[in-house]
């Protein structure tokens, strides 16, 4: 008889490392029981039909089992399949068990349970196969969804049952109980209740006929709950833009199928050997009702391209890594001369000799030996409607010149049907003219000849008058050297435009001819009812626009005094104020705002075609000087841009610019609770982006932590307190179809109801708000706490939420940075400020990822101290600072900090490393107490940003 050695079965997914009843620990190499037997060594279990990954819904206990079982991956209409496994290289009786495990590596026990024809009370399914057919098909499997409220107890029970089964005991030791408690806590953090996998384990009979010989288990593909937003396939439906600048920052509206706002990103990539990829910039608040994303394009990896470059973009889930089909996106080269000023300046300048031949006007000169006026003329586009400069002239040869540039042939060629009061001359072929003359009687011919002679006399008189005036102007110019003498005669020609639509005044501004500008303006103003001063070229630019673009301050002032209209917009909807701010020219902005016509509120708050007013552009350009000038001139610091209703403070928070946000709040008194069209305050944006520094500053300056946006969350528990938990499960699950705006699936909805109902009710009591059944709005909106995924931000918000356990009145703030002694900070500052390049405070700022503050503090008396205060405000600690100094090679600084009393007090070998705020990711999971700062460290973190701009004492949240 063959001897079979059995290693006792042990479940590796529940109790790794727990000792057996004999006191011997299980080696990790023996976690999967092995059957040692010559005939059984080659036996194995395999999945021949995977379960369908998407489209199957998990159900709650109260709903009963599903009407249809979990289908197979290849199942289709008319051909149903189900999950199927088979034992190979073995013939005989066997038992196959199926249970649920997590979608982690390695898989671990899952809280959900299986139901079906062969299921038991423990949530497993067991079937017996053999000896003829070793295939097991599971055609009636259902998955029971548990709530987070019951998740802990179910996991404990499953783990206890596995240990008792594997050890053969009836009770657990205290050590085992504690290990289970800790493992359940860890398991809850990584378990996704919307994803499960099937674990199939085959048991073969031993010598006693008991099914104890286990083959290595096999794990199925992940199965997604169809009610979860993460279960749907990613798909891009539409984009409003498929090309953008190589420098990035273009706003794109993308429509898609249902996504989760905190588990989605837009990835740009190149499918080549370089492997470049980047991600679109957006916050959870930029995801609209799970079906639209508004993001800004990332910059291309190189700015120097001479032709358009096509890349790909796709939607990607952060957790599972699922991606959508790729779409093409084109980066076009950077526009170096968007206003085309440099292109026009590079044109060949005219010379004196250009006007000897083929002059562009009757007085432009003629070739030697030719009569006056027979030189080739150009068609002049007279757009000025008030002009009346048409004239005729004759020559000895009988020809003449019309103001439109056409030559007259014979006066007798006039059309006999002409009935206009003002005579005109038509051009005909000579054959047609001869025929017309021969058919006209002598009386008509005499009349026409007289009429023609009269026209010629009038033309000669006009030409003579113009010649006399030009001659006198030339003599006067020779006497006075004043070019206006010559310009006055041809003042109506100042409306002439070239191929770009530029008038002489445009060209004078482009080429910086200040004296010519002055002379032209004076001549133009002498024309009654003229509009030449405000004429636009083909780019919709007036001379005033060009003066601002080319930064000619005196010219801009002169044009405004002359009556130039500052309200005219260019092709992008930019006023002169927009242009000055976009070029970061605060001096030009000051010149413009001195004139009442520019400082009018309707102009100073006028948006461009993108909906942005000058104050919004000042924030986007990070220019505090322009911002101050505009606000002092009457600009609305809380002005809402037209696309989404963001105020300048919203934009500063969106840019993660702490310095500018503090400046807006403390210096310019921006509304800290201003709302966008979607009801989001700046605090919503800061929290959703996971920024502890901005969040702390806003709440300390009075931001309303309890403010709700307009996006509904899961509804509150029913007013009927007698409603059972299972009933609420059904109600929440079925009602989720009616408020699909929420990003949570049905399980999350139930979990929120079970776990957070008391907290939500308490929050509403603090705001004197009744539950939704007594409110006009059926569902409550998201608060900043609801939007954040950062534990640090959540801690900051909870400290400033009235009524919360961690909330307390604001006390005195610590004076010392990182609780270090004053002399230690001073010595460290001296060491860094006197350090060489690469080992100074700017290098420290770069390594701490706070390089954006270098410009802010470089001219202050204590830049190092200011930098360290911001580092502390971001959640940094002393240990990380020491590690950073060590990486910079500043051993003296490391030694200085290690000798400090603060380091000696708090340092211990077992101290866990804290992750600083600027290293935190937006998707960080809830951290256990072992990963957070201890109480002594928390007390050293300041709760205010007052050190940044110490003017007034900040107020606590409402």
Swiss-Prot record:
The record marks 467-468 as: Cleavage (when cotranslationally processed). Residues 412-425, 917-931 have a biased composition (Polar residues). GO terms for biological process: rhythmic process; signal transduction. Residues 352-390 are annotated as: GRR. A motif (Nuclear localization signal) lies at residues 343-347. Its main location: nucleus. One of its GO terms (molecular function) is RNA polymerase II cis-regulatory region sequence-specific DNA binding. Residues 724-734 have a biased composition (Acidic residues). The keyword Magnesium does not apply. Residues 350-374, 411-442, 705-766, 904-958 are annotated as: Disordered. Residues 753-766, 904-916 have a biased composition (Basic and acidic residues). This is Nuclear factor NF-kappa-B p100 subunit. It comes from Xenopus laevis (African clawed frog). The lineage of its organism: Eukaryota, Metazoa, Chordata, Craniata, Vertebrata. The gene is nfkb2.
């Amino acid at each position: 008889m063959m001897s079979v050695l059995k290693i006792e079965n042990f479940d590796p997914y529940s109790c790794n490392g727990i000792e057996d009843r004999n006191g011997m620990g299980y080696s990790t190499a023996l976690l999967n029981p092995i059957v040692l037997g010559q005939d059984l060594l080659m036996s194995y279990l395999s999945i021949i039909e995977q379960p369908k990954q998407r489209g199957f819904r998990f159900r709650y206990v109260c709903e009963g089992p599903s009407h249809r079982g979990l289908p197979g991956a290849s199942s289709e209409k008319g051909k149903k399949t189900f999950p199927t496994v088979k034992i190979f290289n073995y013939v005989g009786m066997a038992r196959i068990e199926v249970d649920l495990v997590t979608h982690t590596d390695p898989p671990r026990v899952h809280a959900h349970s299986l139901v079906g024809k062969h299921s038991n009370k423990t949530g497993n399914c067991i079937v017996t196969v053999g000896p003829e057919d070793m295939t097991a098909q599971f055609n009636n499997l259902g998955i029971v969804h548990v709530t987070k409220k019951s998740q802990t107890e179910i996991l404990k029970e499953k783990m206890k049952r596995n240990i008792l089964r594997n050890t053969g005991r009836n009770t657990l030791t205290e050590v085992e109980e504690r290990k289970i408690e800790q493992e359940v806590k860890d398991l809850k953090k990584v378990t996704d209740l919307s994803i499960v996998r099937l674990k199939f384990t085959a048991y073969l009979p031993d010598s006693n006929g008991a099914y104890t010989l286990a083959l290595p288990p096999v794990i199925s593909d992940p199965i997604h709950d169809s009610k979860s937003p993460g279960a749907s396939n990613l798909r891009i439906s539409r984009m409003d833009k498929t090309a953008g600048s190589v420098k990035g920052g273009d706003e794109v509206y993308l429509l898609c199928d249902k996504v989760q706002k905190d588990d989605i990103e837009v990835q740009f990539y190149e499918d080549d050997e370089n492997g470049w990829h980047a991600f679109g910039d957006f916050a959870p608040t930029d995801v609209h009702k799970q079906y639209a994303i508004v993001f800004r394009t990332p910059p291309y990896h190189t700015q120097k391209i001479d032709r358009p470059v096509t890349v790909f973009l796709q939607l990607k889930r952060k957790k599972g890594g699922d991606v959508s089909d790729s779409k093409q996106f084109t980066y076009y080269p950077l526009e170096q001369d968007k206003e085309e000023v440099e292109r026009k300046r590079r044109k060949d300048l005219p010379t004196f000799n250009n006007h000897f031949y083929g002059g562009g006007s009757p007085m432009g000169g003629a070739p030697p030996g030719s009569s006056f006026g027979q030189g080739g003329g150009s068609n002049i586009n007279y757009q000025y409607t008030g002009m009346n400069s048409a004239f005729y002239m004759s020559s000895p040869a009988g020809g003449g010149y019309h103001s439109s540039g056409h030559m007259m042939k014979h006066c007798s060629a006039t059309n006999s049907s002409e009935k206009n009061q003002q005579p005109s001359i038509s051009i005909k072929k000579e054959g047609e003219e001869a025929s017309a003359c021969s058919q006209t009687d002598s009386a008509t011919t005499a009349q026409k000849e007289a009429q023609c002679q009269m026209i010629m006399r009038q033309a000669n008189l006009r030409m003579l008058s113009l010649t006399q005036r030009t001659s006198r102007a030339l003599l006067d110019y020779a006497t006075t050297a004043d070019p206006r003498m010559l310009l006055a005669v041809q003042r109506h020609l100042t409306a002439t435009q070239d191929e770009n639509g530029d008038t002489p005044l445009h060209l004078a501004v482009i080429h910086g001819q200040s004296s010519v500008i002055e002379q032209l303006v004076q001549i133009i103003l002498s024309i009654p009812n003229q509009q030449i001063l405000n004429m636009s070229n083909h780019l919709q630019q007036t001379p005033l626009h060009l003066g601002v673009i080319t930064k000619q301050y005196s010219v801009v002032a002169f044009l405004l005094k002359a009556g130039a209209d500052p309200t005219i917009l260019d092709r992008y909807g930019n006023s002169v104020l927009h242009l000055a701010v976009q070029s970061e020219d605060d001096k030009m902005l000051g010149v413009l705002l001195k004139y009442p016509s520019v400082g009018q509120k309707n102009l100073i708050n006028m948006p461009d075609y993108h909906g942005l007013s000058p104050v919004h552009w000042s924030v986007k350009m990070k220019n505090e000087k322009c911002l101050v000038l505009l606000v002092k001139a009457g600009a609305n610091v809380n002005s809402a841009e037209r696309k989404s209703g963001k105020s300048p403070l919203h934009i500063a928070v969106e840019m993660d610019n702490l310095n500018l946000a503090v400046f807006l709040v403390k210096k310019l008194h921006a509304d800290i609770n201003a709302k966008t069209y979607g009801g989001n305050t700046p605090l919503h944006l800061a929290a959703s982006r996971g920024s502890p520094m901005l969040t702390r500053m806003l709440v300390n300056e009075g931001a309303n932590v309890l403010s709700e946006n307009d996006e509904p969350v899961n509804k509150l528990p029913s007013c009927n307190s007698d409603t059972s938990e299972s009933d609420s499960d059904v109600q929440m699950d079925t009602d989720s179809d009616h408020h699909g705006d929420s990003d949570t699936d049905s399980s999350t909805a139930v979990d929120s109801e079970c776990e957070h109902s008391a907290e939500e009710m308490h929050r509403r009591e603090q705001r004197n708000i009744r539950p939704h059944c007594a409110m006009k709005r059926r569902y409550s909106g998201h608060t900043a706490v609801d939007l954040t995924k950062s534990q640090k931000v959540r801690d900051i918000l909870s400290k400033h939420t009235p009524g919360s356990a961690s909330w307390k009145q604001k006390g005195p703030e610590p004076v010392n940075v990182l609780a270090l002694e004053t002399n230690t900070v001073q010595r460290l500052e001296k060491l860094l400020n006197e350090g060489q390049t690469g080992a100074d405070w700017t290098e420290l700022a770069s390594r701490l990822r706070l390089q954006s503050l270098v410009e802010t503090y470089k001219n202050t008396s204590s830049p190092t101290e200011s930098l360290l205060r911001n580092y502390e405000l971001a959640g940094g600690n002393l240990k990380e600072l020491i590690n950073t100094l060590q990486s910079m090679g500043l051993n003296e600084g490391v030694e200085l900090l290690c000798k400090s009393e603060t380091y000696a007090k708090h340092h211990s070998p077992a101290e866990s490393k804290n992750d600083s705020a600027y290293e935190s990711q937006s998707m960080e999971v809830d951290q256990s107490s072992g990963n957070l700062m201890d109480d002594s460290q928390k007390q050293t973190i300041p709760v205010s940003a007052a050190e940044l701009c110490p003017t007034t004492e900040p107020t606590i949240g409402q």
